[in-house]
Amino acid sequence: MLQGLLPVSLLLSVAVSAIKELPGVKKYEVVYPIRLHPLHKREAKEPEQQEQFETELKYKMTINGKIAVLYLKKNKNLLAPGYTETYYNSTGKEITTSPQIMDDCYYQGHILNEKVSDASISTCRGLRGYFSQGDQRYFIEPLSPIHRDGQEHALFKYNPDEKNYDSTCGMDGVLWAHDLQQNIALPATKLVKLKDRKVQEHEKYIEYYLVLDNGEFKRYNENQDEIRKRVFEMANYVNMLYKKLNTHVALVGMEIWTDKDKIKITPNASFTLENFSKWRGSVLSRRKRHDIAQLITATELAGTTVGLAFMSTMCSPYSVGVVQDHSDNLLRVAGTMAHEMGHNFGMFHDDYSCKCPSTICVMDKALSFYIPTDFSSCSRLSYDKFFEDKLSNCLFNAPLPTDIISTPICGNQLVEMGEDCDCGTSEECTNICCDAKTCKIKATFQCALGECCEKCQFKKAGMVCRPAKDECDLPEMCNGKSGNCPDDRFQVNGFPCHHGKGHCLMGTCPTLQEQCTELWGPGTEVADKSCYNRNEGGSKYGYCRRVDDTLIPCKANDTMCGKLFCQGGSDNLPWKGRIVTFLTCKTFDPEDTSQEIGMVANGTKCGDNKVCINAECVDIEKAYKSTNCSSKCKGHAVCDHELQCQCEEGWIPPDCDDSSVVFHFSIVVGVLFPMAVIFVVVAMVIRHQSSREKQKKDQRPLSTTGTRPHKQKRKPQMVKAVQPQEMSQMKPHVYDLPVEGNEPPASFHKDTNALPPTVFKDNPVSTPKDSNPKA
């Protein structure tokens, strides 16, 4: 046989008819990847069984006449904790399962000894996926359905010569319609600076949910296993791309509409996106927690559009996108998925001002032809700016070790059950506190990570690990027993904020002024109170609640809790609907009635000690049950938003009756008091000696009348040296000491970091905006 005559690593220039010719691929060759087995493995296992549990793999092949070793590491972040799959039986009944995915064969990696290289590979049935070597990119696919070591693979060399704009993103045109400019940050009218975070250094976690329509189900012969493998490979590639932004993309669930579509899907991308967004809000969000959902459809979208998403809406009710399955090459579809997700992060299409480190970047408008491998400078800037928005907090919730359902693997940079830490492989690990081989904390050390871990030791109890960001936040302190900072806590709901103009609610300070600014932009003011009387009318221009299609008018006491009325600002809104103005009053009537755009938010102040709750103006006590909650806390503690007692800054949890400030105070007193006594005694001795010397200088020899003066010999004076122990026994003169009871008060240096005065910052926090700024 030919294979027996040639080295298995030899690359043959042979045409392979079994593989479709791909756009941008001029030729393909055959290669026989050989798996390099680690020498330290002692257990003899079948190749399939061994690979199923291998954390790392290496394959050797010849590329351009040189031996190359492809290093692969299992992507354990592909599936999030609690991953579920949903489908429907023939009667339309919803069935949700939590399958144990046995084909754990999705890897990422690179070519060893290459400065620029990455890879996204599936090893389920041979090697299938993408890898790069320097500036050259390759696609690899098996030629045989039989999985064995050394089997032949097709290696595609990807050399695009020119751009093809046959398929694009549906965002073009929409951008300009809303008067936005590409690669310019949106006005931060509702943004809260996360000054205590270095966004680039913190890992982010995207909980990703994918829905496949009925057309997709039929396209892949109603084979759920085939669909699952394709989806996992696409998600693996999306994850590889976003890891370049220090962000993990993990699937929390997949849904296949096996019986029929749950929404109306048409070639109109905007219409389909709106329908999917409504379904997600009314059905999916109530069933499954996630950060973003995308619909993969087999329907061919109108024109050249293959994807559409709402702009800058991650972590909001409009964090959705629609992607057409426009190519047999799943990596091209994965590139579109990453592209539309980028729009959710506020990324615009790349233009001439953007620098791309590779041939093509994720936010290029030519979606279907190119397969992106990196993010441009503009995309990275937009991504960083997005994290100035408090809505982005949903991306910092890393999975707990107890929630991870996969088998713990040391070296995957994910702390799992039984592990103290996981800093990657021995080559990757930079954490001096963690043993990379065992994923345990090194001997004599207490911790390896966390805000309360410093130089591998726990920080002292009472030290602030997360300062209060604003007046509706609470500082968190270390407890001296863990390296982790406690969960973020907020001021008790109803706490006054913004100089009494609002009351805190879940860490925000909702006010009418902030909501007007969010809706209409800078320069907006709250309309006169007389405008709010229109809410008693019960028309679409003023009401309190909507029940089905019926508008419920406000009661006289609730008029400040219905429609939001403002004046001034811009009339250029990113939502469909009507702008209604009369006198100096302005409000918005949205076309989409499923979202309460232009309504006064819950928690907004509507009177003295009153807030809006579900369109009613109620007492704070009725709304939050928080009156006098802090009086029930022991020690120096206050109530938080969940009516739990939290220590005030500077007081040690959990009892909050011991302060590190008192500890430092006692040290200061113990050291300074003896020194002060010694100083006073020494000063008095010096003063006494100086006084005697002065008296001697003032003395003159006495003369008898009529007698010549004569010289007198001065008798030398002996000065006794005072030893330290004798100095302490000397008694100063009474007049050198203050009279008892008239001493000045003791003054000690105040540690302003430990006990700051209560200051209400003029820095209000906005409520998350429940709107869909679509670009």
From Swiss-Prot:
Transmembrane regions listed in the UniProt entry: 666-686
Residues annotated as glycosylated: N268, N275, N557, N602, N628
Maturation and modification: Pro-domain removal and maturation may be, at least in part, autocatalytic.
Domain of life: Eukaryota
GO cellular component: a single term: extracellular region
Disulfide bonds: C315-C394, C354-C378, C356-C361, C465-C485, C629-C639, C633-C645, C647-C656
One GO biological process term: proteolysis
Keyword Secreted: yes
Domain (EGF-like): residue spans on this chain: 625-657
Extracellular domain ranges by topology: 199-665
Pfam families named in the record: ADAM_CR (PF08516), Disintegrin (PF00200), Pep_M12B_propep (PF01562), Reprolysin (PF01421)
Protein name according to UniProt: Disintegrin and metalloproteinase domain-containing protein 28
Organism: Homo sapiens
